[in-house]
Amino acid sequence: MLDNKTIEIIKSTVPVLQQHGETITGRFYDRMFQDHPELLNIFNQTNQKKKTQRTALANAVIAAAANIDQLGNIIPVVKQIGHKHRSIGIKPEHYPIVGKYLLIAIKDVLGDAATPDIMQAWEKAYGVIADAFIGIEKDMYEQAEEQAGGWKEYKPFVIAKKERESKEITSFYLKPEDSKPLPEFQAGQYISIKVRIPDSEYTHIRQYSLSDMPGKDYYRISVKKDGVVSSYLHDGLQEGDSIEISAPAGDFVLDHASQKDLVLISAGVGITPMISMLKTSVSKQPERQILFIHAAKNSEYHALRHEVEEAAKHSAVKTAFVYREPTEEDRAGDLHFHEGQIDQQFLKELIANTDADYYICGSPSFITAMHKLVSELGSAPESIHYELFGPQLSLAQSV
């Protein structure tokens, strides 16, 4: 527990953190990676170059400072980050390193304004925050390892099949090398993949949503070719090759306890966790009404459409596809789609009962737009769930 003086000092630093947060986190990463380059095997180097990771960390530090007297308020965020940490292999011994360089960065950027009292308060506060993460992540590691079929950290899998789904997206069917049964996962969860790319100094870790329902003898991911690792998966790995993956993680999951109508809204590769949710809901809650809305450029970029149409044979499932640039073949054929963008009128015509559970996945700008539209329908905030691919930025910062 922190004393009142420490809490008061930490809260007093919130305005300066809001002003200099990204400068501090940028300095933090630069200094830490300079002295500990081995950590580049864990952290996403692309996010470092795009500076999205420093923004996410700055948001987290500011939130922790603002809620330092009521850390329970940010436990959901801690758990969300904890899932990612467990998935990529963050360990307790990493936290003292992070704390050391965070304090160095605060002092470097704030200079004389970072008084001894402020630095001492932040050292104490970081210890409390780190303990919260370590405790939550310890439980997550134990659950991942001790569940039926579970394992610790990374395990070798074989690419049993590659299947092209669209112009940009290919599915990879992954089976464990030891042929042991796979642990169950919750629809909407992801796995981390660790690969060693030729001529790259460090290993690369990326997260991909599981795109099929639980209960299979494989895990499936459906990957858009858009970056160093995804391009390597598309072009550098073939059926029969081996990759390492961590056990499923993530809290963007389907709530089977709810009996409300289910509205799934996605765009592009954001369809991947939605396919898992759709199939799982049809299997486990066959009476639950489902509306599946997906936006794509056109049919050439629309992955997994046939699987959605197969699920839509179930009487409880309705679908709506939106193409912003349909091809002439799309217009001339018998495909059913709405041309343009998802807007308020479009949603009003589709969603008769707004008292539903909403799940949204896609680019940050898409999620922000859909969250706004769904909120304007009168939907309760706690009924709107979303998954941002990449560092966990706040919704307000995602565009």
Curated annotation (Swiss-Prot):
<dbReference type="GO" id="GO:0005737">
    <property type="term" value="C:cytoplasm"/>
</dbReference>
<keyword id="KW-0813">Transport</keyword>
<dbReference type="Pfam" id="PF00175">
    <property type="entry name" value="NAD_binding_1"/>
</dbReference>
<feature type="domain" description="FAD-binding FR-type">
    <location>
        <begin position="152"/>
        <end position="255"/>
    </location>
</feature>
<dbReference type="GO" id="GO:0005344">
    <property type="term" value="F:oxygen carrier activity"/>
</dbReference>
<keyword id="KW-0408">Iron</keyword>
<feature type="site" description="Influences the redox potential of the prosthetic heme and FAD groups">
    <location>
        <position position="84"/>
    </location>
</feature>
<dbReference type="Pfam" id="PF00970">
    <property type="entry name" value="FAD_binding_6"/>
</dbReference>
<feature type="active site" description="Charge relay system">
    <location>
        <position position="95"/>
    </location>
</feature>
<feature type="binding site">
    <location>
        <position position="190"/>
    </location>
    <ligand>
        <name>FAD</name>
    </ligand>
</feature>
<dbReference type="GO" id="GO:0046210">
    <property type="term" value="P:nitric oxide catabolic process"/>
</dbReference>
<feature type="active site" description="Charge relay system">
    <location>
        <position position="137"/>
    </location>
</feature>
<keyword id="KW-0274">FAD</keyword>
<comment type="similarity">
    <text>Belongs to the globin family. Two-domain flavohemoproteins subfamily.</text>
</comment>
<dbReference type="InterPro" id="IPR012292">
    <property type="entry name" value="Globin/Proto"/>
</dbReference>
<dbReference type="InterPro" id="IPR000971">
    <property type="entry name" value="Globin"/>
</dbReference>
<feature type="region of interest" description="Reductase">
    <location>
        <begin position="149"/>
        <end position="399"/>
    </location>
</feature>
<dbReference type="GO" id="GO:0071949">
    <property type="term" value="F:FAD binding"/>
</dbReference>
<dbReference type="GO" id="GO:0009636">
    <property type="term" value="P:response to toxic substance"/>
</dbReference>
<feature type="site" description="Involved in heme-bound ligand stabilization and O-O bond activation">
    <location>
        <position position="29"/>
    </location>
</feature>
<protein>
    <recommendedName>
        <fullName>Flavohemoprotein</fullName>
        <ecNumber>1.14.12.17</ecNumber>
    </recommendedName>
</protein>
<keyword id="KW-0561">Oxygen transport</keyword>
<dbReference type="InterPro" id="IPR017927">
    <property type="entry name" value="FAD-bd_FR_type"/>
</dbReference>
<keyword id="KW-0560">Oxidoreductase</keyword>
<dbReference type="InterPro" id="IPR001433">
    <property type="entry name" value="OxRdtase_FAD/NAD-bd"/>
</dbReference>
<comment type="similarity">
    <text>In the C-terminal section; belongs to the flavoprotein pyridine nucleotide cytochrome reductase family.</text>
</comment>
<dbReference type="InterPro" id="IPR017938">
    <property type="entry name" value="Riboflavin_synthase-like_b-brl"/>
</dbReference>
<dbReference type="InterPro" id="IPR023950">
    <property type="entry name" value="Hmp"/>
</dbReference>
<keyword id="KW-0479">Metal-binding</keyword>
<dbReference type="InterPro" id="IPR008333">
    <property type="entry name" value="Cbr1-like_FAD-bd_dom"/>
</dbReference>
<dbReference type="GO" id="GO:0046872">
    <property type="term" value="F:metal ion binding"/>
</dbReference>
<keyword id="KW-0520">NAD</keyword>
<feature type="binding site">
    <location>
        <begin position="388"/>
        <end position="391"/>
    </location>
    <ligand>
        <name>FAD</name>
    </ligand>
</feature>
<feature type="site" description="Influences the redox potential of the prosthetic heme and FAD groups">
    <location>
        <position position="387"/>
    </location>
</feature>
<feature type="domain" description="Globin">
    <location>
        <begin position="1"/>
        <end position="138"/>
    </location>
</feature>
<dbReference type="GO" id="GO:0008941">
    <property type="term" value="F:nitric oxide dioxygenase NAD(P)H activity"/>
</dbReference>
<dbReference type="GO" id="GO:0019825">
    <property type="term" value="F:oxygen binding"/>
</dbReference>
<feature type="binding site">
    <location>
        <begin position="206"/>
        <end position="209"/>
    </location>
    <ligand>
        <name>FAD</name>
    </ligand>
</feature>
<feature type="binding site">
    <location>
        <begin position="268"/>
        <end position="273"/>
    </location>
    <ligand>
        <name>NADP(+)</name>
    </ligand>
</feature>
<dbReference type="GO" id="GO:0071500">
    <property type="term" value="P:cellular response to nitrosative stress"/>
</dbReference>
<keyword id="KW-0285">Flavoprotein</keyword>
<comment type="function">
    <text>Is involved in NO detoxification in an aerobic process, termed nitric oxide dioxygenase (NOD) reaction that utilizes O(2) and NAD(P)H to convert NO to nitrate, which protects the bacterium from various noxious nitrogen compounds. Therefore, plays a central role in the inducible response to nitrosative stress.</text>
</comment>
